[in-house]
From Swiss-Prot:
Cofactor field: Mg(2+)
Catalysis performed (reactions): a 2'-deoxyribonucleoside 5'-diphosphate + ATP = a 2'-deoxyribonucleoside 5'-triphosphate + ADP; a ribonucleoside 5'-diphosphate + ATP = a ribonucleoside 5'-triphosphate + ADP
UniProt name for this protein: Nucleoside diphosphate kinase 1
Enzyme Commission (EC) number: 2.7.4.6
Organism: Protochlamydia amoebophila (strain UWE25)
Name of the coding gene: ndk1
Subunit structure: Homotetramer.
Keywords noted in UniProt: ATP-binding, Cytoplasm, Kinase, Magnesium, Metal-binding, Nucleotide metabolism, Nucleotide-binding, Phosphoprotein, Transferase
Active site: 117 (pros-phosphohistidine intermediate)
SMART domains hit by this protein: NDK
GO biological process: CTP biosynthetic process; GTP biosynthetic process; UTP biosynthetic process
SUPFAM superfamilies: Nucleoside diphosphate kinase, NDK
Annotated positions binding ATP: 11, 59, 87, 93, 104, 114
GO terms under cellular component: cytoplasm
Top-level EC class as recorded in UniProt: transferase
Amino acid sequence: MASEQTLSIIKPDAVQNNYIGEIISRFEQAGLKIAAIKMTTLTKDQASKFYAIHKDRPFYNDLVNFMSSGPVVVMVLEGNQAIAKNRELMGATDPKKAEKGTLRADFAESMSRNAVHGSDSSETAEEEVLFFFKPDEITHR
């Protein structure tokens, strides 16, 4: 199986609640490797560009405000089936519907404050990784 990369964001709610280490441990225990990582606070402009796909949705402004409300941890995860593995680890968008043991079931407060973001396809993964990282900032492990 070929190795692939995906983007993961630990959102402001999970950063504020000091879940960074526990979330990263779950990724590593699942066989995903961190190829790049940084902590940053998104500007509203950055958040609006990153989530532009949702601009016509009713939750868009709240999402932009939330994602720019505090620090986030942005990572490139690498491994076999990294995208699917990350999505499985995250669980359903709504933590009330997420399976027990998933990141959102364990660490999310609500559907809008749901702890983590993950790319949903190889196309979006490539775009999202390049949104946050230059190619020379990514280490292949």
